[in-house]
């Protein structure tokens, strides 16, 4: 990959406040807007521009953050509306400048479709945006803009569009085997842990685990989503790859008990995640 220069401006001098991001050679502009600072951008010229935006926050999902993806011809007015009628979000990431209404409609459709396919976040959009047809040249501009969206969201720590590695492409496989459970997975660069399809998990949960909150809720959720399906009287099977926030969240779900994922997951040589990654 080639070197990329990214400029970040703090217009209020506050690292926790509004940020404006630009990339060398790119005509677009990104605004990072904490919800409590929304009205501080009212007087900026760009607040009247067309934009695609992402609202991030915590929802009911114990694993994944929630996101709403939208577009608007005048983005500030739309965010004001969301400030009144959407409770979950705490930060808005807005991409504007260098795009028109047709571009942002195209980008909204592409963003929602890809986010749902990757499935790292709880997508709040109720309606699938219609695809907006562009000319060949407009599409090229929009696709270039979308690459910058993916880059900047990644730089900001939002993995919405980060590809999930396939098992055959992973060089470091870790295994966790316990009573009635045998799972394989790998640690991602984000600190998340993916458990691969075909792994098994123990059905029976320990008494102390049941009395907890996050572990049982997580297991109940992935069972309800049919990610974990009953294989026999003792075991579930993962019917697809699943990303957990941490190695321990993954091992807890596999074992039906509290565990330390950094020592539970071992490579083919028997070394733990802790030995390979933290020492």
Where are the regions a protein language model picked out?
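A general nucleic-acid interaction/assembly signal
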Residues: 42, 130-241, 278-279
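Positively charged interface segments
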Residues: 238-279
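GIY-YIG nuclease catalytic motif and its immediate N-terminal context
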Residues: 1-84, 98, 102-106, 148-173, ...
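Hydrophobic/aromatic-lined pockets within catalytic cores
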Residues: 84, 112, 116-120, 154-157, ...
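Short, glycine-/Ser/Thr-/acidic-enriched flexible segments
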Residues: 60, 200, 249
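Short glycine-/polar-rich loops that comprise or flank the Walker A/P-loop
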Residues: 65, 87-92
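Internal, well-ordered alpha/beta segment that forms a basic, Gly-enriched binding/recognition surface
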Residues: 90-147
